[in-house]
């Protein structure tokens, strides 16, 4: 039996418009040929940890087995709460990994997905992080030498700015809004506590991001491989980490990390 390939977060690049590829065992599979065509993704029932590769019966937090959830640096609490990061102190689940990924330059940014939110990412993850969120525009507002400091700025700004994306609103046709980003930057500058002001930037300009979407559905329904092991339909586009189908169903690839799948050739009906 073909066990298929484990899903991972989609690869994304930006050259005028976002280009997407699935990260599969045999290498990246470009998704542009599938847009406007029938697309079928079949779960094989196999699950494997995104960190250690071990086959398991259950996955946690976007693809980890339980032992890796509690020990892998990629699953540490500071991934979602950067203010708790200890990398700059030489500490963490894996100090070498922490040095490479967290004790390095980070940015604090504002992204626009229909509303403004504040976030943190490693400098080398710009603009990929914004693409993963489905942002149509984003603006860097601070640049710092390590993750924990970026987290402190984010926590302080969460008093006046949202820090989460409304995925349903994001999956609509959202026009870029530079005015909203610049107004939020002014609000952030006034709100940020004095000892963090030295890191604030006023000379950055917003970046626009366009997605490969033929048409946006008026209403979206999220589907999962646990409930629907064969996901098939006309692929109308991709935004964030979501595949958008003609009938309004949407599939979050990243949330299915570690799920093994097989994919039919372009235009093949289920």
Segments from the language model and where they lie:
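Non-catalytic accessory segments flanking enzymatic or RNA/DNA-binding domains
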Residues: 1-270
């Amino acid at each position: 039996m073909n066990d298929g390939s484990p899903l991972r977060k989609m690869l994304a690049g930006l050259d005028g418009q976002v280009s997407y590829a699935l990260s599969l065992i045999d290498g990246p599979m470009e998704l542009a040929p599938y847009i406007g065509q029938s697309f079928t993704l079949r779960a094989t029932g196999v699950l494997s940890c995104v960190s250690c590769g071990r086959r398991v019966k259950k996955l946690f937090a976007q693809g980890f087995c339980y032992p890796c959830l509690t020990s892998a640096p990629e699953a540490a609490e500071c991934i979602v709460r950067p203010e708790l990061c200890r990398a700059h102190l030489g500490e963490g689940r894996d100090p070498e990994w922490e040095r490479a990924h967290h004790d390095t330059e980070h940015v604090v940014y504002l992204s626009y997905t229909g509303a403004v939110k504040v976030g943190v990412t490693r400098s080398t993850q710009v603009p990929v992080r914004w693409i993963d969120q489905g942002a149509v525009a984003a603006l860097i507002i601070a640049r710092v030498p390590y993750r924990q400091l970026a987290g402190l700025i984010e926590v302080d700004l969460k008093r006046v700015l949202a820090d989460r994306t409304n995925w349903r609103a994001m999956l609509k046709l959202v026009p870029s809004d530079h005015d909203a980003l610049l107004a939020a930057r002014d609000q952030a500058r006034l709100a940020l506590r004095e000892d963090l002001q030295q890191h604030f930037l006023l000379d950055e300009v917003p970046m626009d991001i366009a997605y490969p979407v033929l048409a946006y559905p008026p209403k979206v329904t999220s589907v999962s491989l646990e409930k629907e092991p064969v996901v098939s339909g006309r692929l109308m586009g991709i935004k964030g980490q979501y595949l958008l189908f003609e009938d309004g169903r949407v599939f979050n690839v990243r949330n299915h990390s570690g799920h093994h799948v097989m994919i039919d050739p372009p235009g093949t009906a289920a």
